[in-house]
From Swiss-Prot:
Name the UniProt record assigns to this protein: Chlorophyll a-b binding protein C, chloroplastic
Keyword Membrane: yes
Species this chain originates from: Nicotiana plumbaginifolia (Leadwort-leaved tobacco)
Positions that bind chlorophyll a 3: Q138, L148, E215
UniProt transit peptide range: 1-35
């Protein structure tokens, strides 16, 4: 079949020959043509939004200076700061945007997973080891790891089996996010909607644009939080809530500076 030059924008045409673009159709071996939506251009955000456009909030407020020409305020989380020029190349910028958003989402889930079990344990809920890095390490113990402290749920004794399950489950979700099959079609892999938006939060363009900003801001904070949790685990051997309680009880002796000056690796 000749190369296609025009994408379909509607599913019904009368008396008009239309060629299908390669990105909008796939020809199977039995001659069937399967259709797939192409990403439509997002509706422009209102010029009154403080998070988008040339007059958006900048990283240093009124002292920010002029932003790079390629940072136009089109995307959420663009505060006009890129001293290393990481976003100068459009393809690299698009790739880094996707990586950041995905890592933000995992970091938010991870931060919640680190804090919530410890919070429950401090309020009398008993389900085994509550400190995030100690709980996972129980899989290497002789008795293995019981999810939520209940052997009737999941009794894990093999790190390889857990790894395989994670690959399958996470791979299935990522496959749907990117490709959309078999559960449906995906217009934008970064914001797939559909089954990923059961509450319909993205139906209003203005609200959706603001939610994107909130997501990226909270996600960046969560990534820094996870880094802090890792450092705390290495230095103090305690969970984040216990470290917070220690700091509030004695801020002079329990702070980052005090631990940094007294920390000896391996002890």
């Amino acid at each position: 079949m000749a190369a296609s030059t025009m994408a379909l924008s509607s599913s019904s045409f009368a008396g008009k020959a239309v060629k299908l673009s390669p990105s909008s159709s796939e020809i199977t071996g039995n001659g069937k043509v399967t259709m797939r939506k192409t990403a439509s251009k997002a509706k422009p955000v209102s010029s009154s939004s403080p998070w988008y456009g040339p007059n958006r909030v900048k990283y240093l407020g009124p002292f920010s200076g002029e932003s790079p020409s390629y940072l136009t305020g089109e995307f959420p989380g663009d505060y006009g700061w890129d001293t290393a020029g990481l976003s100068a190349d459009p393809e690299t910028f698009a790739k880094n945007r996707e990586l950041e958003v995905i890592h933000c989402r995992w970091a938010m889930l991870g931060a919640l997973g680190c804090v919530f079990p410890e919070l429950l344990a401090r309020n009398g809920v008993k389900f085994g080891e509550a400190v995030w890095f100690k709980g996972g390490s129980q899989i290497f113990s002789q008795g293995g790891l019981d999810y939520l402290g209940n052997p009737s749920l999941v009794h894990a004794q093999s790190i390889l089996a857990i790894w395989a399950c994670q690959v399958v489950l996470m791979g299935a979700v990522e496959g749907y996010r990117v490709a959309g099959e078999p559960l449906g079609e995906v217009v934008d892999p970064l914001y797939p909607g559909g089954s990923f938006d059961p509450l319909g939060l993205a139906e209003d363009p203005e609200a959706f644009a603001e939610l994107k900003v909130k997501e990226i801001k909270n996600g960046r904070l969560a990534m820094f939080s996870m880094f802090g949790f890792f450092v705390q685990a290495i230095v103090t051997g305690k969970g984040p809530l216990e470290n917070l309680a220690d700091h509030l009880a004695d801020p002079v002796n329990n702070n980052a500076w005090a631990y940094a000056t007294n920390f000896v690796p391996g002890k």
